[in-house]
Amino acid sequence: MEEEGVKEAGEKPRGAQMVDKAGWIKKSSGGLLGFWKDRYLLLCQAQLLVYENEDDQKCVETVELGSYEKCQDLRALLKRKHRFILLRSPGNKVSDIKFQAPTGEEKESWIKALNEGINRGKNKAFDEVKVDKSCALEHVTRDRVRGGQRRRPPTRVHLKEVASAASDGLLRLDLDVPDSGPPVFAPSNHVSEAQPRETPRPLMPPTKPFLAPETTSPGDRVETPVGERAPTPVSASSEVSPESQEDSETPAEEDSGSEQPPNSVLPDKLKVSWENPSPQEAPAAESAEPSQAPCSETSEAAPREGGKPPTPPPKILSEKLKASMGEMQASGPPAPGTVQVSVNGMDDSPEPAKPSQAEGTPGTPPKDATTSTALPPWDLPPQFHPRCSSLGDLLGEGPRHPLQPRERLYRAQLEVKVASEQTEKLLNKVLGSEPAPVSAETLLSQAVEQLRQATQVLQEMRDLGELSQEAPGLREKRKELVTLYRRSAP
């Protein structure tokens, strides 16, 4: 009678199977009496094949070891018999199988081999890989199924992939930008490099036409509000007068010995470069002009005191204002960026000179102005001078206009003034130290050349008819230049 767990098998080639253990063992037939028969056993992975003969190709029984729990030693009454048994696992309908080995060592080796076969039979379901196409992922890039469970924290590999993808995206975005680096700001020391750039000027009210110089009173000009005098470039410069007065306080202590010449009929644009000579030429310039100021001051004081209370600053500067207004009405308003900025620090406004002359009376000579704090700052660089222009020019830098003939004249006068000051300083150094005739001659020759060029420019401008009214004043200034040159000779 065959057992339920034993299967009849047909002919199988023995060499085609992997044999883990083989040998002759007595096997019990099972029943009450239990007959023991010699059988040739082959252990192949999780199967135990039973043959009647070693050379026989026909398998009598096939035992599936996955249906059994374990193999252990059988407690027999007579210990001299080496028997072991295969115990079935619960839930299976197979029966236990008993074996008897010839020796004890053979019994132990078979018990160990059969237990390994049982483990392989139980793990057979885990070793097999079954591919179910219905469970495939819908998206190629998803590495796991989107389940309802809570999402696990990202691993280091996942974070590295996210960082690399982000960096690739940033690099791809940078391809569209032509210059993604930080802007480089190169400081420019030269003023002319910033000239081509033009900024839009704010909208300003239209300028009012100038009145006749005789109908304009200095008292009205002083009392006008800021909004009315903003369009005129001459009067708008009074807004910058506190800055120019503060800038001129430091040079006032150094040049306290110098004296300012009196006011004349020449406009301020011509007086900028001739007004304040160096301390060495101040006495000669004063001797020719102090008689003019008292006459002009006393002649203006009489008609004004009857109408309004006396205001000393407008009285002193009335002729100066009239001449400058008449000159600007005849020639038109010049470019604010070139005319109002001067090398020696003086600008066209009348108010920077008011604190210096308000200390004295209208009849006092201009020598009282030596203690003034409004002396021009000689050594101040051009970019720090206060700008004299309208409110719109103060808010935004105006466009650069081509130089007019009067502006060229003004620049030529500035160059003559600067050259004369440099020559005077160098001559003072030469006279104070040991004589150096070679260097003195070189300096004098350069000064003569610059004076010759300036005189030629003035002559050309006068021939054009643009300076017909100021011809007497120019002659006097040219005489002063000749006097300066003669005094500076060693």
Curated annotation (Swiss-Prot):
Coiled-coil ranges (or none): 439-481
A biological-process GO annotation: macrophage apoptotic process
Biased composition regions of type Low complexity, renumbered to the chain: 230-243, 277-297
Oxidoreductase as UniProt keyword: no
Chain spans, region Disordered: 173-402
Domain PH: start-end pairs: 18-119
Sequence positions bearing Phosphothreonine: T232, T298, T311
One Pfam family cited in the UniProt record for this chain: PH
Residues modified to Phosphoserine: S164, S167, S235, S237, S238, S273, S390, S468
Xref: Gene3D superfamilies: Pleckstrin-homology domain (PH domain)/Phosphotyrosine-binding domain (PTB) (2.30.29.30)
Organism domain of life: Eukaryota
GO cellular component, one term: ficolin-1-rich granule lumen
Biased composition annotated in UniProt, kind: Acidic residues: 244-257
CDD domains assigned: PH_PLEKHO1_PLEKHO2 (cd13317)
Keyword terms: Coiled coil, Phosphoprotein
Xref: PROSITE patterns: PH_DOMAIN
Stated name of the protein: Pleckstrin homology domain-containing family O member 2
Species name: Homo sapiens (Human)
Source taxonomy: Eukaryota, Metazoa, Chordata, Craniata, Vertebrata
